[in-house]
Amino acid sequence: MARFPRQQLYIHGAYVDASSNQTFESINPANGEVLAEVAEAGAADLERAVESAEQGQRIWAALTGIERARIMRRAVDLLRERNDELALLETLDTGKPLSETRSVDIITGADVLEYYAGLAPAIEGEQIPLRDSSFVYTRREPLGVVAGIGAWNYPIQIALWKAAPALAAGNAMIFKPSEVTPLSALRLAEIFSEAGLPDGVFNVLTGSGAGVGALITEHPRIAKVSFTGGVATGKKVMASAAGSSLKDVTMELGGKSPLIVCEDADLDRAADIAVMANFFSSGQVCTNGTRVFIPAGLKASFEAKLLERVQRVRLGDPQQEATNFGPLVSFAHMDKVLDYIAQGKAAGARILCGGERVTEGEYARGAFVAPTIFSDCSDDMSIVREEIFGPVLSLLEYQGEDEAIRRANDTEYGLAAGVVTPDLARAHRIIHRLEAGICWINTWGESPAQMPVGGYKQSGIGRENGIASLAHYTRVKSVQVELGEFASVF
């Protein structure tokens, strides 16, 4: 029997059944428990959601920026009041430790919503003088109905990252959470309604990416799609968005990010950063620094420091306060990660720790994989070239700065990168040569609301967060005004 009642769709401020009456299961990856039967949305449900969103958007866009900001801030307050309740739901659905979801997921999502609430009244156009009798002014107008398609690793945070700038600009959003972790987006929709968001301005359709997800990208009355997920799926989304109605797209896709440890680095600090950049959230973070470059002469010392820190990993029941490392998000994903680990072993990489599923006692019921470090890696190995999205660190030795930069850039991805060195001139020199959209110096992983997030190359298009994101949810209308006589050539 499922822990929660059957989960419906959320359309026009209320829960409704899916037209097909079909469902799928949401599973707790820590123990295999069925959390809920969840409605599978189809074409008729999407049409209903679009019509609802169009109605709600007209009301929402007619409000002033200050009025929209007040409602958004009420939602922020509700999110913070219910932080622990939402964190537990997120832990059950994702397998992430409660210590993590309580301190990161809802808090950082609420921060982004508050940030864009502050920007909503500041959306403005320009006045451009042409001559004494004429000028141009511009208006930043909402796109209308937009869509967000979320990933499974940060369900409510990603929903807020996409909804916040869209709502600030006066749009309505249809959001599809990942079918792997669908529960918290529905609670977010309830909170938005309670805060006073007009019906239809935030609708949630649960279901598969291949099903309702594909229908969303094709719908001619949806003006934009913001997608977070893998590169292969992102390419399909972009092709469908362009082929249907030339939709605008924002995409945050995969990564295989390099972390360069310089020869003058504090190795204790570098080891702390490397472990956080690979094992936080059980390695299921898009920006993880999975390719760690270390000077050849420091490799043995650095390996020892990494192993010291792995001893501090407390794998366990995600609901226990002491746990800081939970299961992977699903059993299917666990199998994928284990396959990559097997490929690494077969290719000749040397295992320093982990490299296997954890099956002792109660862990046999969950999707637990031990933190894994490979050394003696080469750039042509699949564990070095392909995104694993799990707790797998690949250690690569290098001889000089130019070599490290060249090899760091030798990838189809360009999401994130980092460097560890006390020499700030060197740090900036290296960072400026790295082909990545998000970079860190002597730290890793923080993505505050003010910081634009997005990738180079095949890691994405556009940006989320920061002022830059707001422009992706508006369109510019130019208006010329003539105060003098009109001179016709006819």
From Swiss-Prot:
Binds 2 potassium ions per subunit. GO terms for biological process: glycine betaine biosynthetic process from choline. It catalyses: betaine aldehyde + NAD(+) + H2O = glycine betaine + NADH + 2 H(+). InterPro entries: Ald_DH/histidinol_DH (IPR016161), Ald_DH_C (IPR016163), Ald_DH_CS_CYS (IPR016160), Ald_DH_CS_GLU (IPR029510), Ald_DH_N (IPR016162), Aldehyde_DH_dom (IPR015590), BADH (IPR011264). The keyword Chaperone does not apply. K(+) 2 binds at residues 246, 457, 460. Pathway: Amine and polyamine biosynthesis; betaine biosynthesis via choline pathway; betaine from betaine aldehyde: step 1/1. Its EC number is 1.2.1.8. It holds the Pfam family Aldedh. K(+) 1 binds at residues 26-27, 93, 180. The active site is at 162 (charge relay system), 252 (proton acceptor), 286 (nucleophile), 464 (charge relay system). NAD(+) binds at residues 150-152, 176-179, 230-233, 254, 286, 387. One of its GO terms (molecular function) is metal ion binding. Its cofactor is K(+). Keywords: Metal-binding, NAD, NADP, Oxidation, Oxidoreductase, Potassium. The record marks 248 as: Seems to be a necessary countercharge to the potassium cations. Belongs to the aldehyde dehydrogenase family. Dimer of dimers. Involved in the biosynthesis of the osmoprotectant glycine betaine. Catalyzes the irreversible oxidation of betaine aldehyde to the corresponding acid. PANTHER family: ALDEHYDE DEHYDROGENASE-RELATED (PTHR11699). This is Betaine aldehyde dehydrogenase. The lineage of its organism: Bacteria, Pseudomonadati, Pseudomonadota, Gammaproteobacteria, Pseudomonadales. The gene is betB.
